[in-house]
Amino acid sequence: MSLSALETSINTAFDARDTVSTATKGEVRDAVEHALDMLDKGEARVAERGDDGKWTVNQWLKKAVLLSFRLNDMSTISGGPGGATWWDKVPSKFSGWGENRFRDAGFRAVPGAIVRRSAFIAKNVVLMPSFVNLGAYVDEATMVDTWVTVGSCAQIGKRVHISGGVGIGGVLEPLQAGPVIIEDDCFIGARSEVAEGVIVRRGAVLSMGVFLGASTKIIDRDSGEIFVGEVPEYSVVVPGNLPGRPLKNGQPGPSTACAVIVKRVDERTRSKTSINELLRD
C-alpha cells in the first residue's frame, strides 16, 4: 500500500470511527498496523520539521494511534516486576526482544524503562526508569532521566537532556491539535512540565520547575517581548510570575504564573559554558 493510499484509508476509517471495533478486519486493521509499525521503526513520525523551521503535523498518523485503541482488545502484557503482567491494549515495544535486537537498536534501557509499541527510540539514547508513550519519537543521543514521562506522539530531538521527573505532555488525553516538540540540543530542568503542543526551540534551556502550556506567557526580561506556545532558540528560561489585577475591594489580586527568558546564548557561547553557569544570573 502506498503512503497516500495508507493516509486515505486511515482518514476514511477515522471519519467512520464509531464503526471500528475489535471485530474490524481487513483494510482498516492492516492500514493501522502498517502505520504503527512505521512509527515504531522511525520510518514515519507524527510531526516533521521543514527546512524553514516550521513543523508539520501528520494528523493521519495521530489518527492511526487513536484508531488502535478501538481495534485492539485488552490482553496481558509481560515484563512486570517478579514476572507479573499488566493488562492493557498496547503491547510493550520490547515484547519478544532479545540481546541481538537490543544491540541492533543501539540504545540503553535500564530496568524500569517502559516504552509502548509505536514509539521510536534512536541510537545512543539512554532510558532511565521512565515512561515513553505510543507514537513518540526520541532522537539520537538523548538522555531520558529517571521518572520522566514522554507523552503520546511527543517529538524529542537529538542530544536533548530531559532531567528527572520531567513531564512532556501528550496529544491523546486530552486531545491536542499538535504534539509537544523539543528540538535538538535542549536542556529541560528537573520537574519541569511542557504540555499542550508547546515547541521548545533548539538549544533552549529550561531551569528546574518551569511549567509551560499553550497559554503560558514567556516573557523576555530584556526586551519585554511576550511569546506564547513557543520558547525561542537558545533561550534560558526560569519560572516567574506576573502581578495580578486588583480585587474589587482594592486589595492586590493573586499573581499569575509565567516563564521568564533571563538571557540568550549563541551556539558558540553554549559550547564553552556549562548548563549550571547558564542558569546562574
UniProtKB/Swiss-Prot annotation:
SUPFAM superfamilies: Trimeric LpxA-like enzymes
Subcellular location, record wording: Cytoplasm
UniProt keyword terms in alphabetical order: Acyltransferase, Amino-acid biosynthesis, Cytoplasm, Diaminopimelate biosynthesis, Lysine biosynthesis, Repeat, Transferase
Catalytic activity entry: (S)-2,3,4,5-tetrahydrodipicolinate + succinyl-CoA + H2O = (S)-2-succinylamino-6-oxoheptanedioate + CoA
A GO cellular component entry from the record: cytoplasm
One annotated GO molecular function: nucleotidyltransferase activity
Gene Ontology biological process terms from the UniProt entry: diaminopimelate biosynthetic process; lysine biosynthetic process via diaminopimelate
E.C. numbers: 2.3.1.117
Keyword Transferase belongs to the record: yes
CDD domains for this protein: LbH_THP_succinylT
InterPro entries found in the cross-reference section: DapD_Trfase_Hexpep_rpt_fam, Hexapep, Hexapep_transf_CS, THP_succinylTrfase_dom1, THP_succinylTrfase_N_sf, Trimer_LpxA-like_sf
Domain of life per record: Bacteria
Pfam family, one: THDPS_N_2
Coarse class of the protein's main subcellular location: cytoplasm
Residues annotated as binding substrate: R108, D145
Pathway where this protein functions: Amino-acid biosynthesis; L-lysine biosynthesis via DAP pathway; LL-2,6-diaminopimelate from (S)-tetrahydrodipicolinate (succinylase route): step 1/3
Subunit relationships: Homotrimer.
Family: Belongs to the transferase hexapeptide repeat family.
HAMAP family the record matches: DapD
Protein name: 2,3,4,5-tetrahydropyridine-2,6-dicarboxylate N-succinyltransferase
Gene transcribed to yield this protein: dapD
